[in-house]
Amino acid sequence: MLANVIVIGAQWGDEGKGKITDLLSRSADVVVRPQGGVNAGHTIVVNDQTFKLHLIPSGILYPDTECIIGSGTVIDPKVLLQEFDQLEALDVSLDRLYISQTAHVTMPFHRLLDQASEEKRGEHKIGTTGRGIGPTYADKSERMGIRVVDLMNPEILRKKLLWTVEYKNVVLDKLYDLPPLDPETVIAEYTTYADRLRPHVVDSSLKIYDAIHQRKNILFEGAQGTLLDLDHGTYPYVTSSNPIAGGACVGAGIGPTMIDRVIGVAKAYTTRVGEGPFPTELDGELNQHLCDRGAEFGTTTGRRRRCGWFDGVIGRYAVRINGLDCLAITKLDVLDQLAEIKVCVAYELDGKTCDHFPGNAAEFARCQPIYKTLPGWQCSTEECRTLEDLPPQALDYLKFLAELMEVPIAIVSLGASRDQTIIVEDPIHGPKRALLYANGDPLA
């Protein structure tokens, strides 16, 4: 049965999409990264080897899987080539990696402007990674960006960079009091990158379209998370692209009718990096416990993640915005030692109960969580491989999350390794959401 599947983060990113995509890549012929840049990192553990990637799709670790970096991404060639080196040193072939000719390129001035802008914001900072993602997307929107195809033509690259660097130097000087960049140095550096990237550059939309018509299984690997979406997230504390399911279609260059299934990934609790409202955020010992047990430090920046209880309100929002068919719940094992676990089922907003995510940032900042308290299981789940292996309280917790979010759970992750996983239902070829709920079991 043909299946083209989108994997989406259902929270604020860092949900464990890398591991889930890696697992699903076994059934995929092609894995596509449709949007985002080096601000998104995913960690995969295979045979005790840890792979930390930012741009190259997780499927690269499977020898027969093609991987495509789509048009909606922004590419930092320096970081991408570092990933080339990391993988080639481990004898991972890159012959199956393709890069969209229309993806935009992050330049040195983008990184400088990102960092300078964040510093100038002071207490109003967004909490960006400082990797130049926002300024790269801004140039794309202002129609002054440089694309991968421009790197492939030295004359066009020189012409565009001479003008762009001159323009950016004025901004760096007048607005941020920073020294100018030498355009010749930038041109020389990026010309070198072009030589190595050239064999991988393709019309990615056409390649994906051809794969669909060849009846290949395609996995679209989303970056960041739903609540970081530029239009539908906790604006302004968001990323500069659209990491929701609809954004995957745009970034890949295909129509929405070509998608068969959307899988959401969520932690068994909630985290976020950077600034912005976070209703279920914890402090003190509980926050420290989740951070330590979950190793909650960003793959990209190393920043400590903020930790809190599972938020069912934003979970239901993610189901609605993305049209999720099923869920993968990760890091259930992080909760193993807790005597009781809370889940946010609604908010109190200005004295009234609110059961939906308010798009207004000021209102969201005033939301107070309304909790349902469930008993913990206080024993290890790391060796569980079936639902029957789980403690009854852990199984009840998962069922509660599925019922709260009104979407079935297809995968449960209990650690970083591939084998620390329970496959509840085939997330690619199994029944759709409506059928599972007709059967009455959210963990069917």
UniProtKB/Swiss-Prot annotation:
Q: Which InterPro entries match?
A: Adenylosuccin_syn_GTP-bd, Adenylosuccin_syn_Lys_AS, Adenylosuccinate_synth_dom1, Adenylosuccinate_synth_dom2, Adenylosuccinate_synth_dom3, Adenylosuccinate_synthetase, P-loop_NTPase
Instruction: Extract one GO cellular component term from the record.
Output: cytoplasm
Domain of life, per the record?
Bacteria
**Pathway entry:** Purine metabolism; AMP biosynthesis via de novo pathway; AMP from IMP: step 1/2
Instruction: State where the protein is found.
Output: Cytoplasm
Q: What positions does the entry give for Mg(2+) binding?
A: 14, 41
Residues annotated to bind substrate: 299-305
Keyword terms of this UniProt record: Cytoplasm, GTP-binding, Ligase, Magnesium, Metal-binding, Nucleotide-binding, Purine biosynthesis
Record carries keyword Transmembrane helix: no
Q: Which reaction does it catalyse?
A: IMP + L-aspartate + GTP = N(6)-(1,2-dicarboxyethyl)-AMP + GDP + phosphate + 2 H(+)
Gene3D superfamilies registered for this protein in UniProt: Adenylosuccinate Synthetase, subunit A, domain 1, Adenylosuccinate Synthetase, subunit A, domain 2, Adenylosuccinate Synthetase, subunit A, domain 3
Which segments cross the bilayer? none
User: Where GTP is bound, by residue?
Assistant: 13-19, 41-43, 305, 331-333, 413-415
Active site (UniProt): 14, 42
Q: Does the keyword Cell inner membrane apply?
A: no
- What detail does the entry give on cofactor binding? Binds 1 Mg(2+) ion per subunit.
Where the protein is mainly located, per its record?
cytoplasm
Q: Which cofactor does it need?
A: Mg(2+)
Q: Which GO terms describe its biological process?
A: 'de novo' AMP biosynthetic process; IMP metabolic process
Q: Which NCBIfam families match?
A: PRK01117.1, purA
The entry sums up its family as follows: Belongs to the adenylosuccinate synthetase family.
Assembly and interaction partners = Homodimer.
Q: Which HAMAP family match?
A: Adenylosucc_synth
- Protein role: Plays an important role in the de novo pathway of purine nucleotide biosynthesis. Catalyzes the first committed step in the biosynthesis of AMP from IMP.
Descriptive protein name:
Adenylosuccinate synthetase
| Organism phylogeny | Bacteria, Bacillati, Cyanobacteriota, Cyanophyceae, Synechococcales
Tell me the gene name: purA
